Amino acid sequence: MSAYIIETLIKILILVAVFSALGGFATYIERKVLAYFQRRLGPCYVGPFGLLQVAADGIKLFTKEDIIPQGANKFIFTLAPIIAMVSAFVSMAPIPFFPNFTLFGYEIKPLISDINIGFLFFLAVGAAGIYAPILAGLASNNKYSLIGSARATIQLLSFEVVSTLTILAPLMVVGSLSLVEINNYQSGGFLDWLVFKQPLAFVLFLIASYAELNRTPFDLLEHEAEIVAGYCTEYSGLKWGMFFLAEYAHLFAFSFVISIVFFGGFNAWGFIPGGIAILIKAGFFVFLSMWVRATYPHVRPDQLMNMCWKIMLPLALLNIVLTGIIILI
């Protein structure tokens, strides 16, 4: 077995382990953030400052009985959370999380694969995760799950179109689909960040990413007041945990990608080293998603579709045309 294969396997194991752990810890952070906005304490009983609440929740999750409803398609019911997990973690393959560094005289590239269509790969594999809620809803033999999967189809497909068109303008400016090249394009300094050249693309992509991530106010797939837990209604134990980890893994992936594409990525930020800079940026966007959840109410499905097709899509197309004209001039 070659050194390259061994290195890649080690990177994959580290990526899955780190982001699985971060997914669990993110629940604690989100509960604390929401509690702060709502003037509550949040988790505070299990361990100092409630830090061991994550471990307690993990033990409870793994010891719960794994129930499959009567009349459900067992194979597809089991396959759906696996698709969600695989889609979330495989989409991270082209993301450069940190600048290259040397360890014991060996240069380490902190990404799985630097492919020249990295951004397209990220969007395509992430979009494949749409099959998880669709199959989960269809296989559960539950009306609420079925409604949730139908909402997943219209919401995720609609916003996948918007996010893809939105990101075309920044890619036209850079001239590459590689996330490493996009990062290097902004290495000149603060004013080279693409957010200043493509502010409309940033806003549209951020909104579309929240819709794709099923984050409030766009969590129509599992709206508690209307359809219980949506496509997850019949899931429990480890299978439910896989959906939950996949959702947070997608959140971290989008936070890193937004930081790389629009905010200079892992380039040094003044006196702040690049590795720390990208952690600050990605951490801010994770926090922003929690802030939005605490601030905005749910939207109706018709409002969401109107915003997608009548507002965001025309703006994305207009941005592409204007960017093309500016490049030609």
From Swiss-Prot:
First-tier enzyme category under EC: translocase
Reactions it catalyzes: a quinone + NADH + 5 H(+)(in) = a quinol + NAD(+) + 4 H(+)(out)
Main location per the UniProt record: membrane
Transmembrane segments: 9-29, 42-62, 75-95, 117-137, 154-174, 188-208, 238-258, 269-291, 309-329
Keywords, comma-separated and alphabetical: Cell inner membrane, Cell membrane, Membrane, NAD, Quinone, Translocase, Transmembrane, Transmembrane helix, Ubiquinone
EC id: 7.1.1.-
Pfam families in the record: NADHdh
Molecular function GO terms recorded: NADH dehydrogenase activity; oxidoreductase activity, acting on NAD(P)H, quinone or similar compound as acceptor; quinone binding
Membrane topology recorded in Swiss-Prot or TrEMBL: Multi-pass membrane protein
Subcellular location: Cell inner membrane
InterPro entries per UniProt: NADH_UbQ_OxRdtase_su1/FPO, NADH_UbQ_OxRdtase_su1_CS
GO cellular component terms attached to this protein's record: plasma membrane
Signal sequence, start to end: none
One GO BP annotation of this record: aerobic respiration
Coiled coil start-end: none
PANTHER family named in the record: NADH DEHYDROGENASE SUBUNIT 1 (PTHR11432), NADH-UBIQUINONE OXIDOREDUCTASE CHAIN 1 (PTHR11432:SF3)
Subunit field text: NDH-1 is composed of 14 different subunits. Subunits NuoA, H, J, K, L, M, N constitute the membrane sector of the complex.
Functional description taken from the UniProt entry: NDH-1 shuttles electrons from NADH, via FMN and iron-sulfur (Fe-S) centers, to quinones in the respiratory chain. The immediate electron acceptor for the enzyme in this species is believed to be ubiquinone. Couples the redox reaction to proton translocation (for every two electrons transferred, four hydrogen ions are translocated across the cytoplasmic membrane), and thus conserves the redox energy in a proton gradient. This subunit may bind ubiquinone.
Family membership noted in the UniProt record: Belongs to the complex I subunit 1 family.
Designated name of the protein: NADH-quinone oxidoreductase subunit H
Species for this entry: Helicobacter pylori (strain Shi470)
